[in-house]
């Protein structure tokens, strides 16, 4: 976020018609180190300059322009340290960020404490963090994860997290949706040693739940993933998903007047195989099917995707890949816009408006090219 497009001040009248695409960084410093006791620390501090834009406004029926201060002088600070505990692979840590803008009494700080415990010869791992953001109001968030990996053939993991409606890291980071919670669990079974026609096999079952603090469930996903590696170095995989009805709150982050909508139950299947990975070329075709159950005779319809990835390895250091797919993705309740109208169905202090959603049908061909060169 340091040096991003200036956007702090907005004019109370008129509009900005021209402005810089980035903020000038006047100075920056980074300090990294480690003490004899094993404490690792890092500090970043940067100062950015003033940035002006051109404001266009009306005065007595005449269009005028002037310089407008969009971004004042600002100081960015990030500090982090970790300390080993119990063993060399377990740590506790602390992190702080602060943004101060010249001439502005606006708080923008955050603090985080975290831990990582690796026990029982790294088979058991427990990690988590708890953080607060200090802006106009204080927000809080936290998460944790506990896992155990058996040396022979299985692994289990569980995780959970939350954020309240005042959690906001947008000043120094990238804000994700707040005011929600999530939890999940995964069981994995594996065969690491060759047996019969298989080099190894992996089976995982994962359950993921998330929702809002008012009780609405926004994700309810059960997933099964099965992958097989054969002795001829071919691969085959299948992935299946079951998703009961949930609610979708994405649109309220576009516009607070939008709806939280109900999404239909759906099921998905993904089948793929790949040819010998030791050859100079590898083919990986796949097929995806997504079947919806519909809500009150509204259904997005079956979604399909057919694709092929071709990987070429002319040398040991150069790899080309071409990934092409054909998608057919119908949908319903797709957000369009909020339209102000004197005859609008809804109203607030600014007047009447309509909220527009639409059914969609997307058919497209995607092709991605990639080249990797190793030195």
What are these regions (language model features)?
Residues 1-100, 158, 181, 267-269, ...:
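Active-site cores of enzymes that catalyze phosphoryl transfer or operate on phosphate-rich substrates
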Residues 21, 51-76, 82, 100-105, ...:
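Primarily recognizes Gram-negative and organellar outer-membrane beta-barrels
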Residues 24-26, 32, 121, 125-375:
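Exposed, low-structure sequence patches enriched in small/polar residues
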Residues 77-83, 87-99, 103-127, 314, ...:
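Transmembrane beta-barrel wall of Gram-negative outer-membrane proteins
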């Amino acid at each position: 976020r340091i040096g991003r497009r200036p956007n702090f001040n907005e004019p109370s009248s008129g509009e900005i018609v021209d402005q810089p695409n980035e903020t000038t960084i006047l100075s920056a410093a980074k300090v990294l180190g480690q003490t004899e006791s094993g404490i690792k620390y890092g500090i970043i501090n940067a100062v950015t300059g003033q940035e002006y834009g051109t404001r266009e406004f009306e005065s007595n029926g005449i269009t005028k322009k002037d310089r407008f201060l969009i971004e004042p002088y600002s100081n960015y600070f990030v500090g982090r340290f970790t300390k080993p505990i119990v063993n060399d692979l377990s740590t506790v840590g602390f992190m702080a960020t602060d943004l101060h803008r010249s001439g502005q009494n606006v708080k923008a700080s955050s603090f985080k404490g975290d831990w990582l415990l690796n026990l029982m010869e790294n088979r058991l791992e427990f990690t988590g963090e708890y953080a607060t953001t200090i802006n106009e109001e204080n927000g809080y968030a936290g998460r944790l994860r506990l896992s155990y990996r058996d040396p022979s053939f299985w692994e289990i993991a569980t995780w959970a997290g939350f954020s309240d409606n005042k959690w906001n890291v947008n000043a120094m980071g990238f804000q994700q949706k707040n005011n929600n919670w999530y939890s999940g669990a995964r069981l994995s079974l594996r065969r690491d040693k060759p047996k019969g026609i298989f080099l190894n096999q992996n089976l995982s079952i994962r359950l993921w739940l998330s929702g809002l603090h008012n009780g609405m469930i926004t994700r309810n996903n059960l997933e099964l993933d099965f992958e097989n590696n054969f002795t001829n170095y071919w691969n085959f995989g299948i992935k299946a998903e079951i998703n009961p009805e949930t609610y979708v709150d994405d649109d309220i982050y576009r516009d607070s007047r939008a709806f939280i909508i109900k999404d239909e139950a759906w099921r998905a299947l993904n089948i793929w195989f790949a040819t010998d990975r030791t050859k100079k070329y590898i083919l990986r075709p796949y097929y995806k099917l997504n079947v919806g159950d519909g809500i009150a005779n509204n259904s997005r319809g079956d979604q399909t995707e057919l694709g092929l990835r071709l990987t070429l390895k002319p040398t040991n250091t150069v790899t080309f890949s071409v990934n092409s797919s054909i998608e057919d993705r119908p949908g319903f309740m797709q957000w369009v816009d909020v339209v102000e109208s004197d005859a609008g169905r809804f109203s607030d202090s600014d007047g009447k408006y309509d909220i527009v959603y639409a059914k969609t049908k997307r058919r497209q061909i995607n092709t991605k090219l990639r080249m990797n060169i190793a030195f």
